[in-house]
């Protein structure tokens, strides 16, 4: 957890029963609307990764882009979007993963990384871990090395962070939310 974790958590809005009954949606838009909170959020990642000589940030469509791009800028490394299927114009590689009710596919450009590139994978939230694991697989298949996965929010009760750790990847979350928070 970040030194700013409690503060960031206090700014995140919980929207009950959205997008469906029984779901507590963790809304990061109040963080984005508050310049001090957004700066602290980005600084949380920059301070953690500034000495790791990353080659790129691979951020997941779409909310991962919001944090991935400024972190890449601050660290002086490249930014690579991991997109939903059919959104990239050049030759891609893809990875399909299972969801609670079905499957989804993410892609990245086939030339996104060079062999041995050191990559940080970023998204806004880890729930079941499927999207993050699919992105990590794409990176490894393209020759990149996943240094760690990073997120604003971890929902530990859904088990995603543990699945990511079990697959051999580190997980950094600025804050965590239990279901009852």
From Swiss-Prot:
Report the pathway entry: Purine metabolism; AMP biosynthesis via salvage pathway; AMP from adenine: step 1/1
GO BP annotation list: adenine salvage; AMP salvage; purine ribonucleoside salvage
Assigned GO CC terms:
cytoplasm
Catalyses which reaction(s): AMP + diphosphate = 5-phospho-alpha-D-ribose 1-diphosphate + adenine
What InterPro entries has UniProt attached to this entry?
Answer: Ade_phspho_trans (IPR005764), PRibTrfase_dom (IPR000836), PRTase-like (IPR029057), UPRTase/APRTase (IPR050054)
The annotated subunit structure for this chain is:
Homodimer.
- Its recorded name reads Adenine phosphoribosyltransferase
What is the name of the gene encoding this protein? apt
């Amino acid at each position: 957890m970040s030194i700013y974790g409690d503060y960031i958590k206090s700014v995140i809005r919980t929207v009950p029963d959205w997008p469906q009954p029984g779901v507590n949606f963790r809304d990061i838009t109040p963080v984005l609307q508050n310049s001090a909170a957004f700066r602290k959020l980005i600084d949380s990642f920059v301070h953690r990764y500034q000495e790791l000589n990353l080659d790129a940030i691979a951020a997941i469509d779409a909310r991962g882009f919001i944090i991935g791009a400024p972190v890449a800028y601050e660290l002086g490394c490249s930014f690579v979007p991991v997109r939903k299927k059919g959104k990239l114009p050049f030759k891609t590689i893809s990875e399909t993963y299972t969801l609670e009710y079905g499957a989804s596919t993410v892609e990245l450009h086939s030339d996104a990384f060079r062999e041995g590139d050191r990559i940080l994978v970023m998204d806004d939230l880890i729930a079941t871990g499927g999207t993050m694991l699919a992105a990590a697989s794409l990176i490894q298949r393209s020759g990149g090395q996943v240094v760690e996965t990073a997120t604003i929010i971890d929902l530990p009760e859904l088990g995603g962070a543990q699945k990511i750790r079990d697959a051999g990847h580190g997980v950094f979350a600025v804050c965590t939310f239990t279901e009852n928070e």
